[in-house]
Amino acid sequence: MVTVDEIRQAQKAEGPATVLAIGTATPPNCVDQSTYPDYYFRITNSEHKTELKEKFQRMCDKSMIKKRYMHLTEEILKENPSVCEYMAPSLDARQDMVVVEVPKLGKEAATKAIKEWGQPKSKITHLIFCTTSGVDMPGADYQLTKLLGLRPHVKRYMMYQQGCFAGGTVLRLAKDLAENNKGARVLVVCSEITAVTFRGPSDTHLDSLVGQALFGDGAAAVIVGSDPLPQVEKPLFELVWTAQTILPDSEGAIDGHLREVGLTFHLLKDVPGLISKNIEKALVEAFQPLGISDYNSLFWIAHPGGPAILDQVEAKLSLKQRKMQATRHVLSEYGNMSSACVLFILDEMRRKSKEEQLGTTGEGLEWGVLFGFGPGLTVETVVLHSVAT
């Protein structure tokens, strides 16, 4: 007779969870940040709000974003005028878009990740799907399973309405699944489309305007598994340690509410200040056991909620400017894509590291950190170990 303990031991993987492939996708419609204020105020019939437009122009100029990708084209917005108004009932119109487009964009990213992984999709044992864009039953996880033709008994996890920290959450969950289920291969997909948050400008809700200046659409997928098959699977990053915490005195700092008018977005406190004030504590908890106290010796992946967060974290920790290079590049080229951002940054980092022959997937360094920041204020921390290139 086999004991429960023996069964448990047999279920566990030998080594740490490892990122084995990454894929990303965006809608084809690309918007230029420098001309976006003109377009945004025209399409929302708000050109008479000249002072507000000047404010928005300044927000866009300071955003450090060059371009973003959006499912919402001028044509779609003209067909759905309620989406362009500031607070018009429009949830049905928004939902009709995102329940189709979120899994579709997710499929595009997942297909690229599976291709890079090089294994048959029948070997995917678990699926984690994450989006803050719309809610449906059965969920986007089910739709993606159908779109990709995954096995019907793939084990699915659907994460709705998590917000910008969730790129860290999905890696934490994938790590636990991979390490506790021998042979598991976890497909992780974050797909975000701003059709739920887009709306016209208002003098009384400037935090909504901040969102209009920052948010973009994108999907990212990773394959995670332990004990990579030699000569078959190519490890990129090892997921060594994870944590999640709610920052003190931060309640209501970032809120989102799903209403008849879509998803409303609220910034109620000094978010960059709260994050920078608490970042060192998170780093000490993560890296003290490894004997690391020089945070410039790490490679950095931080959710680019906005340039002020990155600036204040850099200043607080005396980070060298190049530390946030990959993070700032993704912000500049795509905007804030909520949960998908940190996975885009992982992709950018491994590509750049290979191109520049830096020796490891983490800019030539051995250890790194990935941070997700979002509603709560919630902070996700992931300790990464790079792989030799």
Curated annotation (Swiss-Prot):
It catalyses: (E)-4-coumaroyl-CoA + 3 malonyl-CoA + 3 H(+) = 2',4,4',6'-tetrahydroxychalcone + 3 CO2 + 4 CoA. One of its GO terms (biological process) is polyketide biosynthetic process. The active site is at C164. InterPro entries: Chalcone/stilbene_synt_C (IPR012328), Chalcone/stilbene_synt_N (IPR001099), Chalcone/stilbene_synthase_AS (IPR018088), Polyketide_synthase_type-III (IPR011141), Thiolase-like (IPR016039). Gene3D superfamilies: 3.40.47.10. Keywords: Acyltransferase, Flavonoid biosynthesis, Transferase. One of its GO terms (molecular function) is naringenin-chalcone synthase activity. SUPFAM superfamilies: Thiolase-like. The keyword Acyltransferase applies. Pathway: Secondary metabolite biosynthesis; flavonoid biosynthesis. The keyword DNA-binding does not apply. Its EC number is 2.3.1.74. It comes from the Eukaryota. It is an enzyme of class 2 (transferase). Belongs to the thiolase-like superfamily. Chalcone/stilbene synthases family. PANTHER family: CHALCONE SYNTHASE 3, HYDROXYMETHYLGLUTARYL-COA SYNTHASE. This is Chalcone synthase 1B. The lineage of its organism: Eukaryota, Viridiplantae, Streptophyta, Embryophyta, Tracheophyta.
